[in-house]
Swiss-Prot record:
Residue numbers with lipid attached (N-palmitoyl cysteine): 23
Keyword Cell membrane: yes
Protein's membrane topology: Lipid-anchor
UniProt-recorded name of the protein: Putative lipoprotein SCO2725
Keywords (A to Z) from UniProt: Cell membrane, Lipoprotein, Membrane, Palmitate, Signal
Taxonomic superkingdom: Bacteria
Region (Disordered): 264-285
Length: 285
């Protein structure tokens, strides 16, 4: 079975993982008129991001609306709406647009449910007449088959949609772009970025680094992270732009989400091996 939908993701996955786990900063060169003011403002920014990080980690889950645009697919947006959980390991339970995600060959419904839990992705598909999905309601793929072993390790260590917050707090230079209203809430807008040097220092394989750096170079050499934080010290929106993609995450509600569990094994067909081969071929591994 040829899984066309994976091709759009494979060449860019390494860069996406770097985006989620290594966003640094652009440097707020115009943040203040003097060195003392810059230090004071930098301290305030770090304090605000630290509070947001602590508060978000404490709540452990959220309802999120995500839109991803991939240059490889002509910029057609792929929407994913649902629950993300990071309190006890990485997990998500979302609905995504079937056609935009190129899943129409496996799912007739306009949206496809995707669950990520216990180190694997589960795609709700129509039972196929033959092959590993014959009579199965779900397609299982190991996270490592999509992201690579390093990406899977990063997800285990930093697997929540707000990982960017933790990495921005490690920088002494983050741009404070001022107050903005987002989703009807008053927020403060912060910005940082990651470049090839961050990829080189990552735990990605050499093939994955090559693919990530190539994707970064094709989009200007860096990936920019923007975060909008409200008065309750919670992110309202996070965007990541570059490396051949634009990802926007809007946080609708934090906490009090249902537990995410894997589908029954008897209803699941495993395509990890096939996806791994496609991914390795795409990045030349």
């Amino acid at each position: 079975m040829k899984l066309k939908y994976t091709a759009a993701w494979v060449g860019l996955t390494a860069a996406a993982m770097v985006a989620a786990t290594a966003c640094g900063s652009d440097g707020a060169k115009t943040a203040a008129g003097t060195a003392d003011k810059a230090v004071d403002k930098g301290t305030a920014v770090m304090a605000a991001l630290t509070r947001a990080t602590d508060r978000t980690e404490e709540l452990g889950s959220a309802e999120v609306r995500t839109t991803t645009e991939l240059d490889a697919t002509g910029g057609e947006p792929i929407s994913m709406d649902g629950t993300y959980s990071w309190g006890d390991g990485a997990a998500m339970d979302v609905e995504m647009d079937t056609a935009a995600a190129q899943m129409s060959a496996l799912q007739d419904d306009p949206t496809t449910r995707v669950v990520m839990v216990d180190g694997a992705y589960f795609y709700d598909v129509d039972p196929q007449p033959n092959g590993p999905l014959a009579g199965k309601e779900w397609m299982r793929v190991d996270v490592a088959a999509v992201t690579g072993e390093a990406g899977a390790d990063n997800m285990a260590a930093n697997a929540d949609p707000t990982a960017t917050l933790r990495y921005m707090t490690a920088s002494t230079e983050v741009a404070d772009l001022g107050e903005e209203t987002v989703l009807g809430r008053k927020t403060t807008h912060y910005r940082g970025s990651v470049g090839a040097e961050h990829v080189e220092r990552s735990k990605l394989t050499e093939a994955e680094k090559k693919a990530a750096i190539a994707a970064l170079k094709a989009s200007g050499g860096k990936l920019t992270c923007d975060i909008w934080v409200d008065g309750k010290d919670l992110p309202v929106r996070i965007t990541q732009t570059g490396a051949g993609m634009t990802v926007k995450m809007d946080f609708v509600k934090f906490g009090a989400t249902k537990e995410i569990t894997a589908p029954p094994a008897a209803e699941t067909g495993d395509l990890t091996e096939q996806v791994t081969k496609q991914r390795d071929a795409a990045i030349g591994q």
